[in-house]
């Protein structure tokens, strides 16, 4: 696909949104958001190379390397050894355009329609930017009917729950009882791949190869929630079924809740259970205390990655890690905030042995920072973070200065450092970042952004493979908000979905 055709594809969503806007002028109300973002970046690539095993030499550290100093990887019994050389500079130019349209006042009280789509293209010569295929993606497109007791939704939609974010094409229904504070919902449809708006059978997900399902999975689930004066709770169930094999792709249940026993105190928590693998997934509990001067939080959590049963990753039996953490925000004066956070974690036993090496199974992370606003124009922020874990560690500083010289203009300068020594690699990479951003709002309907950043990377290696991956990125964006006269008029009274305080 040529750059011209890719640019045309990227503009398709904007034209589609404009066309839908014109066709909806007879409706009582609409709201349209058009957003375009572009970036230009150049960075060093790499190319694979090989050398005969007979031509390698032993380097000063005892490993094999080429005659000109590149470390190589030699498999037992192989005639050739592989390594990477610096490649040509690659030019990337991602352009993303999105349109988000909502229509209402369609002749039925409570009926609305929403369409959210995006187009992406790589205008660079190398065509290497990920996420630009397919060029057109439909994120959401559904009709929604809402009343005081019932809500129904039909079409492509994103479901956000304790079990994660997943998209599907189908229907969802919600029933409420204000007197009891209860809400029940159920949904059914054809699921999308996780973290994408594409079917799991799409050719764009071809790295799955022979493990890729040939048909879209069937997604079904539901939930029951309660909300009252002192808290809320929700129970959820979700399953995915492979339509070809008739086998479960996943089956999980989750329970989450929030308790407000006293003023300023909040307890939140949740747990997930994988019925297919018969183990507990993510779980967490936290206690928060909030005042005007201090906010403090302590908590504990378990993290275990979730993989669908049809993938190969579940065969590795991922073990969870358990962590305890604490955070605090202190505001001694009105314009100053101090913050700090720390966490300690440890992995469960993996039931494997490493007789030739000792491997850590625990780690910690911490961060401190401060934000200061001497007046309404300037805001200064700085922080330090450090982390040490199995196989790697990192530490670095970050700082930013923001200025609002005009109500419509915001300027930001920022910088950061990151050092990342790796236990099982040769290099100890370091990255320094300097950048500038500007945002101009000439009206309440238009927002323009412009920025640039330089990333300087130092890959400290004992051989000549310390490839310079420094790069400069430039970005620009525009966001346009459009709406009908009904959109600018006074909003109707909100639909209450929770019982009034004190009714329970």
Model-derived segments and spans:
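Bacterial N-terminal signal peptides
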Residues: 11-23
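Bacterial N-terminal signal peptides that target proteins for export
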Residues: 2-14
């Amino acid at each position: 696909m040529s750059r011209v055709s890719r640019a045309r594809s990227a503009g398709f969503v904007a034209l589609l949104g404009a066309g839908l806007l014109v066709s909806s002028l007879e409706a009582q109300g609409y709201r349209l958001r058009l957003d375009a973002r572009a970036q230009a970046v150049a960075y060093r690539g790499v190319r694979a190379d090989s050398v005969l095993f007979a031509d390698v030499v032993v380097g000063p550290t005892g490993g094999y390397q080429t005659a000109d100093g590149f470390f190589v990887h030699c498999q037992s019994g192989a005639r050739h050894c592989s390594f990477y050389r610096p490649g040509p500079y690659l030019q990337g130019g991602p352009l993303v355009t999105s349109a988000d349209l909502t229509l209402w006042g369609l002749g039925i009280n409570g009926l609305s329609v929403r369409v959210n789509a995006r187009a992406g293209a790589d205008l660079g010569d190398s065509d290497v930017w990920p996420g630009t295929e397919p060029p057109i993606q439909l994120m959401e497109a559904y009709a929604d009917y809402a009343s005081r007791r019932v809500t129904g939704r039909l079409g492509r939609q994103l479901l956000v729950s304790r079990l994660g974010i997943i998209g599907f094409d189908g229907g969802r229904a919600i029933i409420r009882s204000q007197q009891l504070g209860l809400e029940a919902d159920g949904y059914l449809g054809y699921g999308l791949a996780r973290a994408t708006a594409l079917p799991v059978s799409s050719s764009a997900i071809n790295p799955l190869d022979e493990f890729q399902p040939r048909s879209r999975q069937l997604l079904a689930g539901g939930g029951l929630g309660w909300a009252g004066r002192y808290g809320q709770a929700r129970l959820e169930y979700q399953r995915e079924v492979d339509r070809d094999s008739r086998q479960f792709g996943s089956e999980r249940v989750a329970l989450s809740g929030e308790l407000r026993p006293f003023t300023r105190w909040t307890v939140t928590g949740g747990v997930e259970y994988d019925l297919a693998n018969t183990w507990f997934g993510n779980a967490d509990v936290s206690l928060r205390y909030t005042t005007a001067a201090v906010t403090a939080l302590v908590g504990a959590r378990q993290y275990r990655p979730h993989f669908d049963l049809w993938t190969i990753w579940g065969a590795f039996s991922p073990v969870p890690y358990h962590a305890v953490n604490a955070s605090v925000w202190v505001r001694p004066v009105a314009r100053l905030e101090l913050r700090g956070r720390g966490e300690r974690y440890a992995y469960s036993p993996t039931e494997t042995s490493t007789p030739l090496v000792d491997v850590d199974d625990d780690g910690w992370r911490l961060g401190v920072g401060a934000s200061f606003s001497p007046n309404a124009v300037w805001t200064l922020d700085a922080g330090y973070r450090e982390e040490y874990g199995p196989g790697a560690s990192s530490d670095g500083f970050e700082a930013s200065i923001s200025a609002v010289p005009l109500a419509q203009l915001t300027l930001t300068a920022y910088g950061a450092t990151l050092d990342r020594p790796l236990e099982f690699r040769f290099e100890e990479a370091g990255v320094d970042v300097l950048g500038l951003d500007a945002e101009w709002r000439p009206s309440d309907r238009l927002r323009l952004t412009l920025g640039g950043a330089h990333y300087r990377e130092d890959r400290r290696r004992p051989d000549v493979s310390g490839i310079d991956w420094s790069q400069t990125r430039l970005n620009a964006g525009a966001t346009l908000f459009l709406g009908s006269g009904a959109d600018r008029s006074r909003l109707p009274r909100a639909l209450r979905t929770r019982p009034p305080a004190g009714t329970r």
